[in-house]
């Protein structure tokens, strides 16, 4: 197959865009070259996110800048960046990601050090690197880089991970370095995401149960220690357990979020009609945008949004299974990791806004306002599209090779 034919063509003539078959994969491997359902789901979430950011951010934007569309305009600019990132990522072969995963890990590690030295501080946290008018939250890049590194490591040291502790604890040492640098910002939420992804991948790779449970126990103990040693983290935990004990202090944000859900009822107050976003609910367009969705679109709206997010995560897990079956371990582990990442971050964000988990400062994938998060999530989603594209090409080549052999025998 010629190189130009191997490129991912999202609008190729072989694609049938009939709506009844949009979420149904055809059995014939040559009928389509990418996962239309996954792409449609991701684009739907991104477009929906833009609408909700515009709705949730207008009161605060008006108060801070005098322009109610300030955050919406910035969010649109971020989406332009997403389009550029998608175009670039879709053209990179998966073998390149595997080849340069250690280099990517090193570059992001250097950026994490740079954040501590020359980073920009906001609300007491130093998490951003300023590049001209753009501020990059390097911890988001760390999720991306570490996920790719872990997938590559599991392929290179697969047998070693299963047979001895040395192979198991090497990536844990790398994780510990990343975790230390990120905790210095401080950003415990990102560390938890990295830890869960690491544990999940090591389990899928067949690590010994003794090492696996020792890692989980160590992680839980470290998390408890980090919470107990920092008063502000302890306040978050105690306030989430009973926010009504101090509704105008440590429990204020959560109580306002719960009020938003209560007002939403089954069908919501209608798009744009949220009361809590009128500067009652802090971070209404970022970490707590799901509460605004609940208030404006109701229980039905949040079920639909969660269903689409779950679909994306499960599609990634399914893709991982398919890749493992055809002996593409790097692509399989990476798809697994991205699915775990999307699912866990969604659970933490939603859990924090409904009072089931302490606040961690994690965004709702594809929906919350924030350039770095959007860009990284888009890159991860496009990697899934690229993985599936290469898998389908392999299937096409296998079928064509079989036909050639059958013709020769005939």
From Swiss-Prot:
Membrane topology, record value: Multi-pass membrane protein
Recorded GO CC terms: cell division site; plasma membrane
Entry keyword annotation includes Mitochondrion: no
Keywords per UniProt: Cell cycle, Cell division, Cell inner membrane, Cell membrane, Cell shape, Cell wall biogenesis/degradation, Glycosyltransferase, Membrane, Peptidoglycan synthesis, Transferase, Transmembrane, Transmembrane helix
Topological region Cytoplasmic: 1-37, 91-99, 155-163, 208, 313-336, 386-410
PROSITE patterns: FTSW_RODA_SPOVE
TM segment ranges: 38-58, 70-90, 100-120, 132-154, 164-184, 187-207, 209-229, 292-312, 337-357, 365-385
Subcellular location(s) of the protein: Cell inner membrane
Role: Peptidoglycan polymerase that is essential for cell division.
Family: Belongs to the SEDS family. FtsW subfamily.
Protein name: Probable peptidoglycan glycosyltransferase FtsW
């Amino acid at each position: 197959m010629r190189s130009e034919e191997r490129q991912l063509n999202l609008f190729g003539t072989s694609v049938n865009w009939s709506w009844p078959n949009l979420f149904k994969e055809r059995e014939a491997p040559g009928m389509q070259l990418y996962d239309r359902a996954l792409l449609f789901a991701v684009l739907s979430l991104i477009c929906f996110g833009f609408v909700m950011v515009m709705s949730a951010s207008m009161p605060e934007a008006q108060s801070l800048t005098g322009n109610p569309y300030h955050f919406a305009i910035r969010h649109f600019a971020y989406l332009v960046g997403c389009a550029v990132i998608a175009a670039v990522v879709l053209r990179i072969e998966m073998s390149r990601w595997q080849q340069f995963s250690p280099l990517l890990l090193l570059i992001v590690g250097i950026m994490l050090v740079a954040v501590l030295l020359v980073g920009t501080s906001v609300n007491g946290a130093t998490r951003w690197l300023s590049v001209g008018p753009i501020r990059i939250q390097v911890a988001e890049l760390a999720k991306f880089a570490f996920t790719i590194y872990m997938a590559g490591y599991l392929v290179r040291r697969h047998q070693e991970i299963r047979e001895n502790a040395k192979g198991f604890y090497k990536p844990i040492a790398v994780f510990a370095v990343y975790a230390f640098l990120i905790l210095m910002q401080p950003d415990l939420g990102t560390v938890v995401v990295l830890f869960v992804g690491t544990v999940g991948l090591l389990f899928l790779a067949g690590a010994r149960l003794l090492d696996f449970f020792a890692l989980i126990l160590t992680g839980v103990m470290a998390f408890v220690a980090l919470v107990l040693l920092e008063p502000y983290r302890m306040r978050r935990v105690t306030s989430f357990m009973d926010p009504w004990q101090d509704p105008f202090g440590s429990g204020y944000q959560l109580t306002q979020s719960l009020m938003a859900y209560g007002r939403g009822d089954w069908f919501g107050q209608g798009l744009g009609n949220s009361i809590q976003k009128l500067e009652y609910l802090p971070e209404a367009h970022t970490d707590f945008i799901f509460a605004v969705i609940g208030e404006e679109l109701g229980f039905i709206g949040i079920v639909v949004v969660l269903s689409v997010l779950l679909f994306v995560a499960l599609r990634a897990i399914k893709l991982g299974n398919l890749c493992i079956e055809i002996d593409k371990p790097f692509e399989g582990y990476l798809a697994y990791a991205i699915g775990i990442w999307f699912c866990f971050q969604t659970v933490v964000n939603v859990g924090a806004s409904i009072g089931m988990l302490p606040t961690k400062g994690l965004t709702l994938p594809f929906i919350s306002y924030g350039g770095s998060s959007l860009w990284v999530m888009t890159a991860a989603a496009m990697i899934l599209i690229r993985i599936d594209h290469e898998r389908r090409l392999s299937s096409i080549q296998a079928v064509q090779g079989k036909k050639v052999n059958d013709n020769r025998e005939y």
